[in-house]
Amino acid sequence: MTAAVTENNGAGSDSSVAGRVVRVIGPVVDVEFPRGAIPELFNALHAEITLPSVAKTLTLEVAQHLGDNLVRTVSMQPTDGLIRGTSVSDTGKPISVPVGDVVKGHVFNALGDCLDAPGTGRDGEQWGIHRKPPAFDQLEGKTEILETGIKVIDLLTPYVKGGKIGLFGGAGVGKTVLIQEMITRIAREFSGTSVFAGVGERTREGTDLHLEMEEMGVLQDTALVFGQMDEPPGTRMRVALSALTMAEYFRDVQGQDVLLFIDNIFRFTQAGSEVSTLLGRMPSAVGYQPTLADEMGELQERITSTRGRSITSLQAIYVPADDYTDPAPATTFAHLDATTELSRPISQMGIYPAVDPLTSTSRILEPGIVGAEHFRVANEVKRILQKYKELQDIIAILGMDELQEEDKVLVGRARRLQKFLGQNFIVAEKFTGEPGSVVPLRDTIEAFDRICKGEFDHLPEQAFNSCGGLDDVEAAAKKIAGK
């Protein structure tokens, strides 16, 4: 972080005002500055430290003004080797990251340092990560569907172009795989730009994602920004803002429609809780920071559509102990346009993506936006699945034979619908040996309408498993019949 950077939104120039470290407690560092030279909140400070093996520059972000010429900062790197009396310089601007085409195909950390090709982007344009959301008169008023080619999403929980989508679910139900699939589909089908923020997740997952995207040929259209779980809380708290800043440049300067993926937004909240405790704030509900709603709002309000261009955000949200009343996921709910809940029971049935069709929601699933036919078919699918859910207790206790004839027909139809909601993913081809399917929305609506009307009640249930369209179902049925 020794290269000089510029920033296009009035962050100021490098003032190089020197202070000195007076206290170090883990990642929290108190710095004393000369009278009248106190750095502004969120300014980046640099401290040079020398370890036995290497000299390095620490980046500290100003979090509090304590009075008596003292500021409390949060370090973005481990503070090993930092001692009292170390000289600290004020850069006069916030943490800044490279923006533009130079970031595509590369991996960055929260400070904007390129990890796979050191030095990349530091000679070009830089934007500070703390920015205001777009003005009200710049927001896009039109609502448009983002067609994904994934049947269960397009039909029952349609995504809003320029909206915020939450992927809810416990550990191991497929949140990261669904995000990888969306990145692949956006790059292949729409030639769109994606920015991925890895917030507090496993380093192994980040490495796997990078290698898989390179293998799939979509890395050149994606910027990756990582602050993984082995990093200090300051980094994990800021990495989402760094990725969002890169996405904002593509939207505001290049006029592109961008997809921003955040995995995992819960770790953003968790890092904020750690920082809040380190700064001495009184904890709020369930031990979370009292500023939880404010911090979440600062991030989410910048993710929006402006006139003619958009940032659509897909956010994986870990739900602690599958408790949806936990303040972290509950606070995120208020900002979302659509929620996709991944269900463990559906995952255990071998149906992927394991989206729960009854609890997943979308604010645009109404006739005035998606159309009367789409709305009618989606509601009919939900009605049949809901009735099947109500009958499951009776089936478990008394068996299918005790049901009325019309209920037996409905149960069979519901099971076919349930299996048909799954489909093969492009990113899973090497595991399943089956090609991934992309189903147009028009075909999805027609297929589910025909299944709901009973046109395929004569086909075996297993023929519907992980199929793309009705042609795949009929082919699978013939294959089963031939055995």
UniProtKB/Swiss-Prot annotation:
Recorded hits in SUPFAM superfamilies, A to Z, give: C-terminal domain of alpha and beta subunits of F1 ATP synthase, N-terminal domain of alpha and beta subunits of F1 ATP synthase, P-loop containing nucleoside triphosphate hydrolases
Q: Which PROSITE patterns match?
A: ATPASE_ALPHA_BETA
Q: Would I find Nucleus among this entry's keywords?
A: no
Q: Where in the cell is it found?
A: Cell membrane
The reply to whether Cell membrane figures as a keyword in the UniProt entry is yes
Q: Which UniProt keywords apply?
A: ATP synthesis, ATP-binding, Cell membrane, CF(1), Hydrogen ion transport, Ion transport, Membrane, Nucleotide-binding, Translocase, Transport
Positions that bind ATP: 169-176
Per the UniProt record, which residue ranges are transmembrane? none
Gene3D superfamilies recorded for this chain? 2.40.10.170, Bovine Mitochondrial F1-atpase, Atp Synthase Beta Chain, Chain D, domain 3 (1.10.1140.10), P-loop containing nucleotide triphosphate hydrolases (3.40.50.300)
This entry's Gene Ontology molecular function terms read: ATP binding; ATP hydrolysis activity; proton-transporting ATP synthase activity, rotational mechanism
Please provide, in alphabetical order, the Gene Ontology terms of the cellular component aspect for this entry: plasma membrane; proton-transporting ATP synthase complex
- Cite the EC number: 7.1.2.2
Query: Subunit arrangement?
Result: F-type ATPases have 2 components, CF(1) - the catalytic core - and CF(0) - the membrane proton channel. CF(1) has five subunits: alpha(3), beta(3), gamma(1), delta(1), epsilon(1). CF(0) has three main subunits: a(1), b(2) and c(9-12). The alpha and beta chains form an alternating ring which encloses part of the gamma chain. CF(1) is attached to CF(0) by a central stalk formed by the gamma and epsilon chains, while a peripheral stalk is formed by the delta and b chains.
Query: In which family does this protein belong, per the annotation?
Result: Belongs to the ATPase alpha/beta chains family.
HAMAP family per record:
ATP_synth_beta_bact
Q: What is this protein called?
A: ATP synthase subunit beta
Q: Which organism is it from?
A: Rhodococcus opacus (strain B4)
